[in-house]
């Protein structure tokens, strides 16, 4: 007969009418009983022949992905002109006095941030914008280009101008070496790029000769020179051969020749000196691509009147006859002045050699589930986290639930600050630019590659493609609608572009680490400046707490002014005042302790409503269910151990079938949530110890011992002793010498025992006491006669790695011992 829910509850000692604990609890450690219960609840039967269920409520598993929804009316968010002050350490020191070693180290990490991957894979420009929405290709292309343009205008991206130079908007940092420093700076650099000076100077010829010894493939080199691109080292990189602005077009060959000869007009003496063997008219240098000339600065030797000689793909339509009612020339002729082919930033700097490639693709999604009106750019730099050359990102400590509760559960008033575009505050060194490239190959290539018009694709490498091969009704209608949104920017956005990150991007594993270091250092400074208040951060979420509302408001004003003086942009509309219950990291934290936020409780209820019984559920769906239930597990009676059968099925990659009893058990567990309370400091006066055959307790001056009916594994025996100590004494601070009991992770014990022990020991704090000093050591070995002196072991609540009381460094700094005795648990501990 299957086990009923009531019987199962009684078995786990969750009901009050259970017998004496010393008899009942050791039974739960019995392997035979655990196996029988698992069979009764159908937990062990992992091989099932019925088809798996792949969807439970909103949770989907294998073979199904959520279809992203494209919104043609997405607004591109605006970015303030974010510029974090370079002398941030000096400004903090003016505010709070000398910084601690920790604060200084963290702030130096991000001024500027550096990124050196082992290997960088370069992808063709066509992969720059991902075809994420096949139905809305053109629309998505322009929206993404507009987003990238907005980021560039806000000083978040560099624009690659030539192989060795980039331009950007906004205020420069000292490590961004300006191009206009005069001739001296060029001698130290391996690249000769001149942004403003005239094109053929002797300086460059000197330069080229010096580099020529390294060149074997001179043919590629001559082909690379166009406009301002003086890429010398490019020949080393066979992947970086194509000129920067490449667009297949009707006049591909002719334009290319013109550009070759035109660029020779300015540099012929230099050219011939450096490359005597290379002919300027190389037939194969043009693979059907028009070379664009927007790389030339407006005041260079080429005059404005010559521009029509090298028309760009977009403007070529102006002179051609419409091929149909949907010809692109009809759109191009709507405007007389389409504006420049390219924009250049306010500052030009030197960068390491950057090929005309991208290293990651981009696409747009909704800003968040609650805001579908605005878009968010997703950058896929996952190449750095994959494969043999993956970068192992630095680990950083995040406070666990208990530490967080100890820190923040108090009778303070709270408010949270919203840092706008937090990642884009942290500057990246220009040396990282070649590794973090995004961009696009221009509209013509994008449409050609993704259109069903095979003529375009076939013509790319053979005969000259016809300009009007691109015209189609879909493209015409899309562009006409986009023309109403973007106007003459359609022309600018239809050109190829390559952008590198100037601030840290979100798609790299290094960024969360750097952001966490930055905000925690700033909060540490604020805590020392206002010792009677509390400031705490997780990523970009910063919270302030103070004793009264008036006090909090004045703290808010002072901290806001301080953050603004550092160049940190706050979003005043999103400042939230929480009163005494702080909503933070998915929890509600008040003076009673922590509970999950209401929306998570609703999600759990919804999950149980949709959870089928007696049907095998795909283990991928089980992962999603465990993710949700695991978040709230610390607030239930049995905690994580209750989810162990689910964990086991996920590990063995088998389907899981919920029996009615197990589902009812979990459902009841999650309907009544108990707050996790903050730990209080105190003295430990109750000690527990065990041997495989017996247990012993010391409570004040009272000592007890007992034996087990059969020998047990030592960890199990120690856990039982701790449970007896708690139930006998009611004390919430217990001394033990077992590291597993100390860790309060009961998932490795027999399943029923783990569930019962979690409930008995809920809210208990443990203090480590070495075996040699443990007063309960003798009773556990059956010796009650000898009485050891009672230890006075103080218990201090843990706050993880967050030091709330960092000593200001005017005191001579010495590092205190973290742990005062060789605790196996603390030695082996890694940040969660």
Swiss-Prot record:
Region (Polymerase/reverse transcriptase domain (RT)): 336-679
Region (Spacer): 178-335
Entry's EC annotation: 2.7.7.7, 2.7.7.49, 3.1.26.4
Effect of mutating residue 330 to H: In strain: Latvia
Pfam families attached to this UniProt entry: DNA_pol_viral_C, DNA_pol_viral_N, RVT_1
Result for mutant: residue 178 to E: In strain: Latvia
Binding site for Mg(2+): 418, 540-541
Regulation: Activated by host HSP70 and HSP40 in vitro to be able to bind the epsilon loop of the pgRNA. Because deletion of the RNase H region renders the protein partly chaperone-independent, the chaperones may be needed indirectly to relieve occlusion of the RNA-binding site by this domain. Inhibited by several reverse-transcriptase inhibitors: Lamivudine, Adefovir and Entecavir.
Segments of this protein annotated with the region Disordered: 186-225
Site (Priming of reverse-transcription by covalently linking the first nucleotide of the (-)DNA) residue list: 63
Domain of life: Viruses
Gene Ontology terms for molecular function: DNA binding; DNA-directed DNA polymerase activity; metal ion binding; RNA-directed DNA polymerase activity; RNA-DNA hybrid ribonuclease activity
Catalytic activity: DNA(n) + a 2'-deoxyribonucleoside 5'-triphosphate = DNA(n+1) + diphosphate; Endonucleolytic cleavage to 5'-phosphomonoester
Entry-linked PANTHER family: POL PROTEIN, RIBONUCLEASE H
Free-text function comment from the UniProt entry: Multifunctional enzyme that converts the viral RNA genome into dsDNA in viral cytoplasmic capsids. This enzyme displays a DNA polymerase activity that can copy either DNA or RNA templates, and a ribonuclease H (RNase H) activity that cleaves the RNA strand of RNA-DNA heteroduplexes in a partially processive 3'- to 5'-endonucleasic mode. Neo-synthesized pregenomic RNA (pgRNA) are encapsidated together with the P protein, and reverse-transcribed inside the nucleocapsid.
Protein name, entry field: Protein P
């Amino acid at each position: 007969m299957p086990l009923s829910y009531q019987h199962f509850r009684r078995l786990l000692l969750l009901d009050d009418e259970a017998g004496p604990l010393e008899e009942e609890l050791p039974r739960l450690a019995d392997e035979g009983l655990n196996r029988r219960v698992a069979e009764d609840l159908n937990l062990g039967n992992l091989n099932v022949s019925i088809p798996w269920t792949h969807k439970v409520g909103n949770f989907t598993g294998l073979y199904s992905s959520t279809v992203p929804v494209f919104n043609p009316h997405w607004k591109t968010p605006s970015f303030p002109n974010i510029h974090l002050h370079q002398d941030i350490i000096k400004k903090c020191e003016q505010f709070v006095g000398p910084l601690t070693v920790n604060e200084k180290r963290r702030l130096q990490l991000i001024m500027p941030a550096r990124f050196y991957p082992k290997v960088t894979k370069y992808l063709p420009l066509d992969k720059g914008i991902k075809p994420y929405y096949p139905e809305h290709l053109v629309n998505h292309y322009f929206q993404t280009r507009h987003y990238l343009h907005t980021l560039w205008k806000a000083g978040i991206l560099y624009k690659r101008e030539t192989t060795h130079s980039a331009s950007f908007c906004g205020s420069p940092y000292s490590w961004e070496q300006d191009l206009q420093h005069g001739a001296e700076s060029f001698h130290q650099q391996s690249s000769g790029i001149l942004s403003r000076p005239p094109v053929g100077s002797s300086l460059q010829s000197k330069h080229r000769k010096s580099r020529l010894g390294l060149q074997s493939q001179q043919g590629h080199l001559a082909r690379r020179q166009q406009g301002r691109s003086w890429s010398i080292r490019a020949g080393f990189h066979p992947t970086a051969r194509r000129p920067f602005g490449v667009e297949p077009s009707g006049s591909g060959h002719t334009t290319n020749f013109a550009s070759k000869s035109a660029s020779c007009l300015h540099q012929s003496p230099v050219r011939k000196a450096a490359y005597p063997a290379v002919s300027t008219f190389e037939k194969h240098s043009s693979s059907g691509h028009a070379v664009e000339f927007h790389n030339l600065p407006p005041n260079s030797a080429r005059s404005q009147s010559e521009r029509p000689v090298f028309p760009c793909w977009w403007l070529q339509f102006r002179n051609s006859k419409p091929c149909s009612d949907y010809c692109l020339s009809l759109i191009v002729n709507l405007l007389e002045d389409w504006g420049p082919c390219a924009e250049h930033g306010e500052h030009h700097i030197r960068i390491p050699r950057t090929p005309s490639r991208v290293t990651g693709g981009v696409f747009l999604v909704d800003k968040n589930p609650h805001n579908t009106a605005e878009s968010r750019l997703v950058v896929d730099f996952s190449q750095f986290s994959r494969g043999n050359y993956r970068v192992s990102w630095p680990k950083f400590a995040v406070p666990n639930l208990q530490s967080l509760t100890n820190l923040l559960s108090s009778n303070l008033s709270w408010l949270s600050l919203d840092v706008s575009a937090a990642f884009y505050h942290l500057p990246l060194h220009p040396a990282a630019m070649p590794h973090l490239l995004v961009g696009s190959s221009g509209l013509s290539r994008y449409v050609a590659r993704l259109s069903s018009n095979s003529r375009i694709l076939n013509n790319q490498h053979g005969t000259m493609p016809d300009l009007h091969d691109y015209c189609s009704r879909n493209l015409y209608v899309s562009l006409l609608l986009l023309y109403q949104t973007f106007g003459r920017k359609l022309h600018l956005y239809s050109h190829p572009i390559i952008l590198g990150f100037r601030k840290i991007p979100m798609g790299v594993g290094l960024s969360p680490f750097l952001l966490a270091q930055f905000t925690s250092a700033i909060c540490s400074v604020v805590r020392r400046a206002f010792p009677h208040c509390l400031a705490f951060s997780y990523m970009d979420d910063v919270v302030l707490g103070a004793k009264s509302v008036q006090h909090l408001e004045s703290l808010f004003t002072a901290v806001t002014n301080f953050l603004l003086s550092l160049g940190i942009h706050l979003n005043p509309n999103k400042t939230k005042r929480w009163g005494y219950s702080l909503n933070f990291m998915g929890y509600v934290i008040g003076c009673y302790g922590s509970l999950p936020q209401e929306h998570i409780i609703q999600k759990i209820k919804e999950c149980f409503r949709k959870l089928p019984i007696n049907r095998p559920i795909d283990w991928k769906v089980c992962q999603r269910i465990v993710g949700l239930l695991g978040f709230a597990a610390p607030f239930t009676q049995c905690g994580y151990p209750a989810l162990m059968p689910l964990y086991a099925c996920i590990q063995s990659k088998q389907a899981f079938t919920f029996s009615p009893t197990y589902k009812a058990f979990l459902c009841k567990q999650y309907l009544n949530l108990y707050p996790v309370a903050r730990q209080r400091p105190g003295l430990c006066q109750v000690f527990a110890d065990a041997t495989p055959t017996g247990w012993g307790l010391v409570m004040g001056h009272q000592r007890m011992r007992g034996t087990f009916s059969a020998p047990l594994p030592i960890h199990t025996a120690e856990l039982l002793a701790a449970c007896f100590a708690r139930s006998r004494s009611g004390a919430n601070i217990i001394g033990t010498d077992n590291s597993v009991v100390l860790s309060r992770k009961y998932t490795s014990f027999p399943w029923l025992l783990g569930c019962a022990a979690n409930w008995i020991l809920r809210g208990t704090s443990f203090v480590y006491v070495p075996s040699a000093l443990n007063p309960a050591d003798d009773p556990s070995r059956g010796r009650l006669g000898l009485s050891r002196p009672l230890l006075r072991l103080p218990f201090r609540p843990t706050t993880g790695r967050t030091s709330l009381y960092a000593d200001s460094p005017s005191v001579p700094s010495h590092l205190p011992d973290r742990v005062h005795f060789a605790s196996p648990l603390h030695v082996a501990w890694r940040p969660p």
